[in-house]
Design a protein with these regions (language model features):
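Cell wall/extracellular polymer interaction/catalysis modules
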Residues: 1-81, 91-123
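Short, conserved phosphate/pyrophosphate- and ester-handling motifs at nucleotide-, phospho-/glycolipid
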Residues: 88
């Protein structure tokens, strides 16, 4: 899967303009999440595609739901996110190795209830 490295100037924008819900490189502060502040969680991460193209981004509907490393690495017990999904580092690496944007992968987010995995597999 193609990737880019977070720099000290990397932000995920929540500004109400053309940069809403996109990655922005800026020397000045941008409204939204300063991605470098989430180290080591964002050592490996990807965007689930929530409220992103090909659908039109809708301001106020929320920005990215990232799938990122749990912290401390490899331990998902007692870990909280800001609305993202945290999984062990080795699982993120496995996912990044097999995800292919040309195959249009998608992310199903929900609660684990009886029959849920069967329903998801039906897709």
């Amino acid at each position: 899967m193609p990737y880019r490295r977070i720099t000290k100037d990397s932000y995920w924008s929540s500004s109400q303009n053309s940069t809403y819900n996109t990655w922005v490189e800026s020397k000045t502060r941008v409204a939204g999440e300063h991605l470098a502040d989430a180290d080591p969680q964002y050592e490996y991460a990807f965007n689930s595609g929530y409220n992103s193209p090909p659908n039109t981004r809708v301001f106020g509907r929320g920005t990215a739901i990232f799938i990122h490393c749990s912290e401390p690495p490899g331990n998902s017990l007692g870990v909280f996110t800001h609305g993202c999904i945290a999984i062990p580092r080795d699982r993120i690496v496995q996912l990044l190795d097999i995800l292919d944007p040309a195959r249009h992968p998608w992310c199903a987010i929900g609660t684990l209830e009886a029959g849920t995995s069967t329903s998801i597999k039906a897709y």
